[in-house]
């Protein structure tokens, strides 16, 4: 039987797409700009120094994929090691640069319509929408109602929130409503219930996600977001690869926020973990648990590594992003070592979030495709026209019918 491990390095783009100008992202390049900053000494800290060092990702072809994407070699990744897998890059067919669009397209369902957005920087949400939420959730009111950085807004409004019980509502350039509440004074379960109420009321606005942003602490300097974040996404508009796997008796194990992104659709089992190390460890645990089970049931293990995006991309923390990449690279041999002979491993991303770029939003970029396994073609698979090529490849690997979008790059079974 077959087993595949699909890991999304959330926001790890490798070069602006041809249509990036339309998003204000022409020239963005998450990988290249991090590598350039490291080479210039701008990322030297107590935790790391010198050029960006990603030897294991580079052996899978990351450096070559990055250079093929943008025409420039990332400093520290120029040396051409012996490539042990498949490498390439893909552009996005979907209309946006958000998490659901990227993940759904990876699973064969690009978002070809436009999401709804709250574009006003101040007084961002329609009064009638907030009034309906306040009434149903029995709130004393709301705070925020702006475009904001999630870490900054809890510093600015966290004390007032604790004193009044008014939740903090904010948004961004993404199709999203984010709600920040104190875990202890407001309550975590109450925050989740508020997000479910909000999800219902924003459906007519075609908004992709409501995100619960719990935090703790007693002062602006001490406030910090916790790992109890939850995403309340609208379900995919068509069956994804996950649904098709489930419908054919195959197992989909979602690790991290994957289940939330697909609104639970097509997920056999969800495993929650918080932090890069914990998410990789959870992936390894599931790989070890399914060693024997995989002989009886085809299994897709699907992990999202959110820290790259949430902690470093949006916060424009170049040093933190570089160190996290190096930390993941050091964990990669454990993942490769846990693979069975016929396993397939795919590493990719869902969009960019260049930490050197102005603002705090995602960037429209190519994503890397790095693949390892017996049926992975050796070397360069070129520029792919859609993220859905990943889903189509997995559909072929699991012997499913063709998906509506994408072209497989799998080699024939030997």
From Swiss-Prot:
Cofactor comment: Binds 2 manganese ions.
Keyword annotations of the record: Cytoplasm, Isomerase, Manganese, Metal-binding
Subcellular location: Cytoplasm
Nucleotide-binding in keyword set: no
Record's keyword annotation contains Endoplasmic reticulum: no
EC numbers on record: 5.4.2.7
Top-rank taxon: Bacteria
GO terms, molecular function: magnesium ion binding; manganese ion binding; phosphopentomutase activity
GO BP, sorted A to Z: 2-deoxyribose 1-phosphate catabolic process; 5-phosphoribose 1-diphosphate biosynthetic process; metabolic compound salvage; nucleotide metabolic process
GO CC annotation, single: cytosol
Amino-acid positions noted as binding Mn(2+) 2 in the UniProt annotation, renumbered to this chain: 309, 314, 362
Catalytic activity of the protein: 2-deoxy-alpha-D-ribose 1-phosphate = 2-deoxy-D-ribose 5-phosphate; alpha-D-ribose 1-phosphate = D-ribose 5-phosphate
Cofactor: Mn(2+)
EC supergroup of this enzyme: isomerase
Residues the entry annotates as binding Mn(2+) 1: 10, 350-351
Listed pathway(s): Carbohydrate degradation; 2-deoxy-D-ribose 1-phosphate degradation; D-glyceraldehyde 3-phosphate and acetaldehyde from 2-deoxy-alpha-D-ribose 1-phosphate: step 1/2
Record's function text: Isomerase that catalyzes the conversion of deoxy-ribose 1-phosphate (dRib-1-P) and ribose 1-phosphate (Rib-1-P) to deoxy-ribose 5-phosphate (dRib-5-P) and ribose 5-phosphate (Rib-5-P), respectively.
Family under the similarity heading: Belongs to the phosphopentomutase family.
Name of protein: Phosphopentomutase
Gene field: deoB
């Amino acid at each position: 039987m077959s087993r595949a491990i699909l890991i999304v390095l959330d926001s790890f783009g490798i070069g602006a797409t041809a249509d990036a100008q339309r998003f204000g992202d022409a020239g963005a390049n998450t990988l290249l700009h991090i590598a350039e900053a490291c080479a210039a000494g701008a990322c030297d800290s107590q935790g790391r120094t010198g050029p960006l060092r990603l030897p294991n990702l580079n052996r899978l072809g990351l450096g070559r994929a990055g250079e093929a994407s943008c025409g420039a070699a990332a400093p520290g990744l120029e040396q051409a090691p012996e490539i042990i897998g498949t490498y390439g890059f893909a552009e996005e067919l979907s209309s946006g640069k958000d998490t659901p669009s990227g993940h759904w397209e990876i699973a064969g369902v690009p978002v070809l319509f436009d999401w709804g957005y709250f574009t006003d920087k101040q007084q961002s949400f329609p009064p009638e929408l907030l009034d309906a939420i306040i009434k149903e959730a029995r709130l004393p009111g709301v705070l925020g109602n702006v475009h904001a950085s999630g870490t900054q807004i809890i510093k600015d409004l966290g004390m007032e929130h604790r004193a009044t019980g008014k939740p903090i509502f904010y948004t961004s350039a993404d199709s999203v409503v984010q709600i920040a509440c104190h875990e202890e004074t407001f309550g975590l379960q109450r925050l989740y219930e508020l997000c479910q109420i909000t999800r219902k009321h924003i459906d007519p606005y075609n908004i992709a996600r409501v995100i619960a942003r719990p935090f703790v602490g007693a002062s602006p300097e001490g406030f910090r977001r916790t790992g109890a974040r939850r995403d309340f996404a609208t379900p995919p508009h068509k069956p994804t690869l996950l649904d098709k796997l489930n419908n054919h008796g195959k197992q989909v194990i979602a690790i991290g926020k994957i289940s939330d992104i697909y609104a639970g659709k097509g997920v056999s089992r969800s495993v929650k973990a918080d932090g890069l190390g914990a998410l990789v460890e959870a992936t390894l645990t599931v790989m070890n648990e399914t060693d024997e089970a995989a002989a009886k049931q085809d299994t897709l293990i699907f992990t999202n590594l959110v820290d790259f995006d949430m902690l470093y991309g949006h916060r424009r923390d170049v040093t933190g992003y570089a160190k996290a990449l190096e930390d993941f690279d050091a964990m990669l041999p454990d993942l490769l070592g846990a693979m069975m002979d016929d396993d397939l491993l795919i590493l990719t991303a869902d969009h960019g979030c260049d930490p050197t770029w102005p603002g705090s939003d995602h960037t429209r970029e190519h994503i890397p495709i790095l693949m390892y396994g017996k049926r992975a073609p050796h070397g360069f698979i070129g520029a792919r026209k859609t993220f859905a090529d990943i889903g189509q490849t997995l559909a072929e690997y699991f012997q499913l019918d063709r998906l509506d979008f994408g072209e497989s790059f799998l080699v024939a079974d030997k």
